[in-house]
C-alpha cells in the first residue's frame, strides 16, 4: 500500500512543501525567518479575529470598545497586546528576512523576490490601517497625515484623498473602511505567501555560500522542522516577555488619549517599524518629492537584482560588500532614530545625510564595489 503522504492529492502538496522538500545541508539560522513570518501571520489572524468579535468600527465607540476588550473581556488584554506586539515581531522578522535576502543574494530568484516586495507593501498597508483602529490621538493624526500625502499626486491628488477618506476629513467612513480592509488584507497576504512559496519551490532554497547545493541536499523534516521550532520558541519567548512585562514599550502614550480633531499632538509619528521611511519622507522639503522618496525607499528593493554586478551571488566571500551592507544596516538604525525625533537642528541634517547615504549605498556604492571586487579577483 502506498503511503498516504505520497498518494493523497492534498497531503502530497504538504509533503512536498514541508516534509520531503530537499533543502541545502548548510543553510543557517538566517533561513528560519520564513517559517517565523508564517507563524506571525497565523498569530495575527487568530488574535485579530477574536479582537474583531468585540471591536466596533464607529468613531463614537471605537476607543471605548478597545478599553472594554482590555478591561472586561476574559484575557482581552492578552489578545490586544499579543496583536499589537505581534505586529512588532512580524516586522522584526520581515526586516531580518529581507536583510538575509540582500546579504546572501537571494534576490536572484526574481519571481520569489518580487512577490516578497509586494508582500512587504501589503503588510505595511495592513499595519498602518490597524494602527488607526483604536482611534486614539496618534491613530487619528497618523491617518490624517499619511493619507494626506496622496494629495501631492498631481491633478488627481485631492480627489483621491477625499475618496479614500469618504468625506472631507478622516471620520466615521474612514474608520469603517479601514477596519474592513484591515480584516481582509491578511487573508490576501496568506494567499500571496502561498504564491511566494510556490515560486521558491520552483528553484529551491539559496544557501550561505551562494553556490548551487544540488549535490548535497537533505530532507526538510526532521532537520529543519526541529531547527525552525527552536527559532519559534525563541520568538515566542521574546513576544511573551514583551506582552507580559512591558506591553506598551513600543507603543505611543498619545494613543491612550481618545482622538480629537481639534487638538494636534506635539509630535506626530508612526509606529517604530515605519520610522526609517518616515525619516526619508521628512528629509525632503518638497511634498511630492518626499512622497516619491518614501515610496522609492521600499520600491528600490525591486531593482536590487538589476544592480547586482558581482560574479559571486552571496556576500560571504566579499569583505568590501559586507562593510557596505553593515553600513546600510547602521544607516537604517540611524533613520529609525531620526524618524522619532522632532523636526529641528541637528536632526534634520542628520536625516538628510542618512537618506542620501541609504539611496547611494544601494544604487551606486554596492554595484561599484562589486565591480571592484571582480577586478581584484581578476574575474
Curated annotation (Swiss-Prot):
Transmembrane region(s): 33-53, 77-98, 113-133, 178-198, 226-246, 288-308, 320-340, 347-367
List of residues binding heme b b566: 97, 196
InterPro entries: Cyt_b/b6_C, Cyt_b/b6_C_sf, Cyt_b/b6_N, Cytb/b6-like_sf, Cytochrome_b, Cytochrome_b_C_euk/bac, Cytochrome_b_N_euk/bac, Di-haem_cyt_TM
Binding site for a ubiquinone: 201
GO biological process: mitochondrial electron transport, ubiquinol to cytochrome c
A Pfam short name: Cytochrome_B
Bilayer disposition of the protein: Multi-pass membrane protein
Listed SUPFAM superfamilies: a domain/subunit of cytochrome bc1 complex (Ubiquinol-cytochrome c reductase), Transmembrane di-heme cytochromes
Function description: Component of the ubiquinol-cytochrome c reductase complex (complex III or cytochrome b-c1 complex) that is part of the mitochondrial respiratory chain. The b-c1 complex mediates electron transfer from ubiquinol to cytochrome c. Contributes to the generation of a proton gradient across the mitochondrial membrane that is then used for ATP synthesis.
Family: Belongs to the cytochrome b family.
Protein name: Cytochrome b
Organism per entry: Myotis yumanensis (Yuma myotis)
